[in-house]
Regions:
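Acidic/His- and Gly-rich active-site-bordering loop/insert found
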Residues: 1-95, 100, 104-124
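Sec/Tat-exported extracytoplasmic proteins
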Residues: 3-4, 11, 15-18, 39, ...
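Metal-dependent amide/peptide-bond hydrolase catalytic core
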Residues: 205-342
Length: 342
């Protein structure tokens, strides 16, 4: 309670930055300065990512890591405290998924736990890290690849939700692969000599159309989305290069790979039909999450002890207005009055 104002200031400050993935420079500078002032050592640019960092304090076991995402969403600019769509800047990015809240609250938790550990001479190490470019699957796999979690005993991950709770076992969310297919053909003048060209854009369109026909045969839990990330330069030139960007989602690793292989075959087929070549580039990955029961049940007891915040009438009015605005079917009664189920 003594740090309520600090919490609100930090959450609002990160909200004001509204930085897209791999562009979280102001957020990184702001958060790491606060951690430095409170005795944490900072390593910046981890895993070769300029906006990524890791903060540490303490020594010995257990090593407890606190993580949360920090990037925002394109074209989600929004005035705070307004229930309807009202951007601060039209078309600008914004924190439409609440990624402005997690890391600030982890910082406050870490500072508080650090004080308790110092007072009671409790051994252990606290680690904080940001989920940079989470919306693009940008970093967590690379942190793991480069060994940043090798000595971690437990990782507690924070994300905004409709209630205060914790879970264990398989997560409800999917894992996925982010992959971009780039087709290379032959440029030509579209009017003067189109027969000399081999259109990479045609290959992209064929892959997109082919995947739409594939959807009927996907498992109910399989999800996929794609955009054309490069469609060529201008209409009077046969595009020599074009790209299409896919997310392939599923609950288990084998099923994610099954979707990925289907995508690869479709890309090869599109290249064959257009006499182009194709290259694939994995941009990121996130495997399905599995949460620890012992950690979850222990945290849940603490959640029951702490309880929910005391909501004001203004809090409830805004929450209900937002729920009505988005036509929510699940949450309609404003802020929760009971702690969520484990």
């Amino acid at each position: 309670d003594s740090r309520t104002k600090m919490a609100q200031v930090m959450v609002d400050k990160v909200f004001s930055f509204s930085e897209l993935g791999f562009q979280e420079y102001e957020t990184a500078k702001y958060i790491t300065e606060i951690l430095k002032e409170n005795g944490f050592t900072i390593e910046t640019g981890i895993a070769g990512i300029p906006t990524a960092w890791m903060a540490k304090w303490g020594n010995g076991k257990p090593v407890i890591a606190l993580g949360s995402d920090v990037d925002c969403i394109p074209k989600a600019s929004q005035k705070p405290g307004v229930a309807y769509h009202d951007p601060i800047i039209e078309g600008a990015p914004g924190h439409g998924e609440g990624h402005n809240s997690g890391v600030p609250l982890n910082v406050l938790a870490a500072i508080t736990v650090k004080e308790i550990m110092e007072r009671d001479k409790i051994p252990g190490t606290l680690v904080l890290w940001p989920g940079v470019a989470e919306e693009q699957l940008g970093t967590k796999a690379y942190f793991t690849r480069d060994g940043y979690f090798d000595n971690v005993d437990v990782c507690l991950f924070t994300h905004v939700s409709s209630n205060l709770g914790v879970s264990w076992g398989e997560a409800s969310g999917t894992g996925l692969i982010s992959v971009e297919y780039t087709f290379n053909g032959e440029s030509a003048h579209s009017a003067g000599a189109p027969w000399r060209g081999r259109s990479a854009a045609d290959a992209v369109e064929l892959m997109s159309a082919g995947w739409q026909y594939q959807r009927e045969h996907l498992d109910p839990l399989q999800r996929s989305h794609h955009i054309i990330s490069n469609g060529g330069d201008q209409p009077n030139v046969v595009p020599s290069q074009a790209s299409i960007w896919f997310y392939f989602r599923q609950i288990t690793y084998p099923e994610i790979m099954e979707l990925y292989e289907k995508g690869n075959k479709m890309a090869e087929g599109a290249a064959m039909m257009t006499n182009t070549t194709v290259e694939k580039r994995i941009l990121g990955s996130a495997w399905p999450r599995h949460y620890n029961k012992t950690v979850a049940t222990t945290m849940y007891e603490n959640i029951k002890t702490v309880g929910l915040p005391t909501w004001t009438n203004e809090d409830q009015m805004l929450a209900k207005a937002v729920q009505k605005e988005v036509n929510s079917k699940r949450d309609t009664d404003g802020m929760p009055m009971k702690i969520g189920e484990l």
